Structures are given as structure tokens and as C-alpha cells.
Amino acid sequence: MGRILNRTVLMTLLVVTMAGTAFSGSFNEEFDLTWGEHRGKIFSGGKMLSLSLDRVSGSGFKSKKEYLFGRIDMQLKLVAGNSAGTVTAYYLSSEGPTHDEIDFEFLGNETGKPYVLHTNVFAQGKGNREQQFYLWFDPTKNFHTYSLVWRPQHIIFMVDNVPIRVFNNAEQLGVPFPKNQPMKIYSSLWNADDWATRGGLVKTDWSKAPFTAYYRGFNAAACTVSSGSSFCDPKFKSSFTNGESQVANELNAYGRRRLRWVQKYFMIYDYCSDLKRFPQGFPPECRKSRV
């Protein structure tokens, strides 16, 4: 079950908010392969990881450490060719029915058709905050960096250091925000052909299996939590304890322009614009969705 830190521990963590610890090491040291038997592999001296999916099973891994606020970077190269029906998920999550979660999900497609990048935020077990995007490149040709920046003020989703989505803390409007539960990093490759591609109309072509996604370049500048206490490396204090100034650096004028560019040309779904879904009015956090 996901732990909710007591008030004393939480206040201690917030005092050192974002005095981060950077981990840019071996997948062997930082992650456990959790399911899929031989379908998950760590190789190249711990610098590379792959997940595979076949008709029998997918595969997945999770971090050994738990994090509470920080920036998580991972380079991925997604399943090439006909990836319809497959989902590559990369996300932060706590455990239990009132869990918090911050999601990247890459929904596969038929050969020559674009992946859909699905994002979502869960707080206290409630999600339904989806935004979806096409990418401005082919994510199967090369590695690209997908980042989650998690702060008490907001969550930023980034692709190759370009912000694509900002989820602001709207607790003053009664909207829960992920800030109390430490989360681990998870990733999995699995079959979801009942919904992933065109709402389930396109099924997985098992003649193309195994499907494989590749990972490298993991980095975490974050606070880790263990047994109710936190560890943050002081050498990152200057970049993570500056509060609003650091937030401004992440979303400076150029970053805001890039965010608007992505949302204008590549966003294909936004729950904050779905009148059919919310005929009585949009969720309250949608009022704070613009940057």
C-alpha cells in the first residue's frame, strides 16, 4: 500500500524540497525486472534495458528507490514497425486504492501511422485527466528523452526537453495533487488491443512478435524516501531549492512558446476541452491549465 507520510516527515521533506539526488547509473543498480521472465533484459554492462512482448506475455520493471519530487529522465526507443495494439508505459506511481500516478503511455499503431502519446495524472486514486499527443518525430528510429518534472507547484511532461503538458497544483480549488506519497518508477510493455489503437478496432498482429522497446540514459535528480526519511544530495540544492526561480527557468518565455506550439499542432485530445464528457462544466483544475 502507498505510504502517506506523517506531517513531521512531510514538513521535513518540504524544507529540503527539490534538493535533489542524481542517479545516472546502471540499470542493474537502479531497477528490478519484475515480470515477463526472459522478456526483460539488462545488457551492455547495465547501460541498456529492453522489454519485449509476445503472445504469451509482456514484461516490465520498476525502480528500487522511491521518489518524492524531482526530475526523472529516461531515453526510449519504441517498438518499430506494426506496433498496433501494444502499449509501452513509463510512469511514476505509489501503491494502493488511493495511489498517485503520473503517466506516459505510448499507444502503438499500424506501420506508417503515428504513435499516440497518452498522458494522465492520478491523485488519491482519481485520474481521468487525459491529454494525448502525436510526436513531431518517429519515436522508433532513435532514442528520445521523456521527462517528468514533479514539484509541489506543478507537474511538467517533457519530450526532448520540450514541455508538452503542465498540470498545476489546484488544491485551493479542492483538486487533489500528488505530493504526499512517494512513488517508484515503472515501465511495462503489454498487449492492449481491446482499446489502444483506434479504440480497439486494430488488433495486435502476432506474426510480428516479439515486439521490443529499448531504454537507456536514466537520470533522476530527486529526493528519495526510505523508511519515512529522505535523502537529498546537497550538491543539487542550488538548482532545486530556488523555488519559484527554478519554476521560471523550467517554463521561461521560450519554454512557454514551445508548450503552446506542441499543444496547438500536436495535441489531439484534452479532457479540459471535451464538452461531450463534461456537459455540466469542466473540472475545476481546467481553470488553471493555461501557462
UniProtKB/Swiss-Prot annotation:
Gene Ontology cellular component terms for the protein in this record: apoplast
Enzyme Commission number, as recorded: 2.4.1.207
Glycosylation sites: N109
Top-level enzyme category: transferase
Disulphide-bonded residues: C223-C232, C272-C286
Post-translational events: Contains at least one intrachain disulfide bond essential for its enzymatic activity.
Subcellular location: Secreted, Cell wall; Secreted, Extracellular space, Apoplast
Positions annotated as active site in the UniProt record: E101, E105
Signal peptide start and end residues: 1-24
UniProt key word Transferase: yes
Keyword annotations from UniProtKB, A to Z: Apoplast, Cell wall, Cell wall biogenesis/degradation, Disulfide bond, Glycoprotein, Glycosidase, Hydrolase, Secreted, Signal, Transferase
Annotated function: Catalyzes xyloglucan endohydrolysis (XEH) and/or endotransglycosylation (XET). Cleaves and religates xyloglucan polymers, an essential constituent of the primary cell wall, and thereby participates in cell wall construction of growing tissues.
Family indicated by similarity: Belongs to the glycosyl hydrolase 16 family. XTH group 2 subfamily.
Protein name in the entry: Probable xyloglucan endotransglucosylase/hydrolase protein 16
Species of the source: Arabidopsis thaliana
